[in-house]
Amino acid sequence: MAFLLITRRLACSSQKNLHLFIPGSRYISQAAAKVDIEFDYDGPLMKTEVPGPRSKELMKQLNTIQNAEAVHFFCNYEESRGNYLVDVDGNRMLDLYSQISSVPIGYNHPALAKLVQQPQNASTFINRPALGILPPENFVDKLQESLMSVAPRGMSQLITMACGSCSNENAFKTIFMWYRSKERGQRGFSKEELETCMVNQSPGCPDYSILSFMGAFHGRTMGCLATTHSKAIHKIDIPSFDWPIAPFPRLKYPLEEFTTDNQQEEARCLEEVEDLIVKYRKKKRTVAGIIVEPIQSEGGDNHASDDFFRKLRDIARKHGCAFLVDEVQTGGGCTGKFWAHEHWGLDDPADVMTFSKKMMTGGFFHKEEFRPSAPYRIFNTWLGDPSKNLLLAEVINIIKREDLLNNVARVGKTLLTGLLDLQAQYPQFISRVRGRGTFCSFDTPDEAIRNKLILIARNKGVVLGGCGDKSIRFRPTLVFRDHHAHLFLSIFSGILADFK
């Protein structure tokens, strides 16, 4: 019934709200509020502060059964559409955060609503199988239509999961098994290995490690948390492993003015990576793999050059380490290529690549040589969700049909240019503007100013996200257009002009 209601509302989308006033903000012209996708609104519409009274009441109720302090507001997903998120108090906001970068083609896309209503798809949404032992007849076909159609170069193997953390966690396990298999050679498991692994001892449980970078975020499960170094609150009180942590480059901006400094900074970090690999080998805690994000997201939208990643890949190969690229947040098209690591121009592809968020399901691609040697070694009950593969196949069709990767590249230039203009106009509030595609960000003077700007923007009808200590990040959908960027820039310019 909910999807029928959504479809009826989408059919009435031509009845637009033509007056766009945001309390306390400048008037936004109708040209800026142009609608060019059939299921979008024409602009923000604010009725209360956010969170409003209904959200506050629901937050209070939720807090009686769990800690709800992280909740921003409650949403009305039936009324949300396109690039606009509607809350339970009727506030309609331009969403440039898109559920922490996880909404690919906007809210309630008509094609997805239609897909859900088709009778032949009902059983896929009703029945969630244990895919590792009882997959449905069309499972292989749907994987080919969805995930395998966008498989990264050099990776023919795929394992689906439910989220980003379990994707990275199982990718680590895959790397450890691969590395031990190389050491073991052709022989099978020894009696000693089989016995000692049951009591968490060597040689059955070898003391391998994964090298990660300071500022990284790879998830919150035990193995992933050992490679996550973005915020202390994620890690405090949780036992962890002695695994190596390398510095990630801290680039100076504008890039063209600091070429030499940035090259030296990247060289310093790469040298430290090699030193740590050698150090941990001597400690008998061999680095089996290196994990890196194409852009450190939660840690502050930290970038490095394509050359840095090419050299990092060379170091991994030189020392026999697996090279794992975490595309959980950067994957799915938001940098202007389907996978952000495609920008690097690697001669030798990465060994393993994890994904989630905009891909609507989790999992990882890997090279043939990383294939598990026996069943149940990489396994859980669900191993993903076929209904998400069904939706993803249609999302990928829309990305191709509407040329959304080029849209992201084009609109990203509009957004980045506008942010640079605001930086020139308000250098006291904005610095280090950076981005790739619409995956953009900038720094503010401190955390307090950053948080205040995000709250003011929300009450003006724009949802933004924070990251790192003092950065604001942009994570719009792939159907974010030029006029959405201009609309945001107009609103945010007014905020900065009045900011105290």
Curated annotation (Swiss-Prot):
One Pfam family it belongs to: Aminotran_3
GO MF, any single term: succinate-semialdehyde dehydrogenase binding
Alphabetical list of SUPFAM superfamilies matching this protein: PLP-dependent transferases
Binding site for [2Fe-2S] cluster: C163, C166
Cofactor remark from the record: Binds 1 [2Fe-2S] cluster per homodimer.
List of residues binding pyridoxal 5'-phosphate: G164, S165, T381
Gene Ontology biological process terms from the UniProt entry: cerebellum development; copulation; exploration behavior; gamma-aminobutyric acid biosynthetic process; locomotory behavior; negative regulation of blood pressure; negative regulation of dopamine secretion; negative regulation of gamma-aminobutyric acid secretion
Coiled coil: none
Location within or outside the cell: Mitochondrion matrix
Residues the entry annotates as binding substrate: R220
One CC-aspect GO term: 4-aminobutyrate transaminase complex
Keywords associated with the record: Acetylation, Aminotransferase, Disulfide bond, Iron, Iron-sulfur, Metal-binding, Mitochondrion, Neurotransmitter degradation, Pyridoxal phosphate, Transferase, Transit peptide
Enzymatic reactions: 4-aminobutanoate + 2-oxoglutarate = succinate semialdehyde + L-glutamate; (S)-3-amino-2-methylpropanoate + 2-oxoglutarate = 2-methyl-3-oxopropanoate + L-glutamate
EC number of this enzyme: 2.6.1.19, 2.6.1.22
Transit peptide region: 1-28
Needed cofactors: pyridoxal 5'-phosphate; [2Fe-2S] cluster
Modified residues (N6-(pyridoxal phosphate)lysine): K357
Modified-residue entries (N6-acetyllysine), positions: K252, K279, K318, K413, K452, K470
Family label: Belongs to the class-III pyridoxal-phosphate-dependent aminotransferase family.
Oligomeric and partner information: Homodimer; disulfide-linked.
PANTHER family in UniProt: 4-AMINOBUTYRATE AMINOTRANSFERASE, MITOCHONDRIAL (PTHR43206:SF1), AMINOTRANSFERASE (PTHR43206)
Function recorded in the entry: Catalyzes the conversion of gamma-aminobutyrate and L-beta-aminoisobutyrate to succinate semialdehyde and methylmalonate semialdehyde, respectively. Can also convert delta-aminovalerate and beta-alanine.
Protein name as it appears in the record: 4-aminobutyrate aminotransferase, mitochondrial
